[in-house]
């Protein structure tokens, strides 16, 4: 529902011959294809790929998902939107800033160069957006505490108030960070009780939980719909 039309036929994933880092999900006769860059420095990516595919089906939007490991991957993909997945933020920084990658400097420049570009950062991805540590301003206007929820054993699931979606959302927290504060320029995107668990600055959305581990595609639909709107 939510004012969106269901797809007219099932979507089929097409992996181009010889490609190991790109998925093309065909739409129902659409001619415009959204290119989604999925940062692959460390951490799981399959949940986001599956969520993007389901979201594309629900929105009837044709997408290509490009995995990004190096700065050259970002340039080649020329994405309309970015997903920064969870993982271990320290490892992601080391890998993404290494001379063999340099993805993070290129990515942060890409994000800062156009405030309309949609970005979804989850868990460790939210840490990188709030605390890029590259000498520039934060990419979302919030202070964040890494691993504030503690150990893997302290992970949990709970219903959230997804204010950006206008409804509840099933949240999955795994060694989650915590927003300590946010500026007036940032919009609260999700709440867990009295605690802010999602912050939006422009079209950059940082979530301390893992929406890709839920069957609800609301946040991935937001990314695709925002990218489609920005490109229209």
Predicted features, each with a name:
Residues 45, 89-91, 126-128, 180, ...:
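Glycine-rich nucleotide phosphate-binding loop and flanking beta-alpha elements
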Residues 168, 178-232:
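C-terminal and late-domain segments of enzyme folds
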Residues 81-85, 120, 173, 206-208:
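Structural motif
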Residues 134-195:
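Pocket-forming structural segment of enzyme catalytic cores
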Residues 4-98, 217-221, 225-232:
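N-terminal beta1-alpha1 cap of cysteine-dependent amidohydrolase-like domains
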Residues 34, 61-63, 117, 135, ...:
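A structural micro-motif
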Residues 89-161:
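Cysteine-nucleophile active-site neighborhood
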Residues 74-76, 112-114, 120, 163-166, ...:
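Solvent-exposed alpha-helices and their adjacent loops that cap or buttress functional pockets
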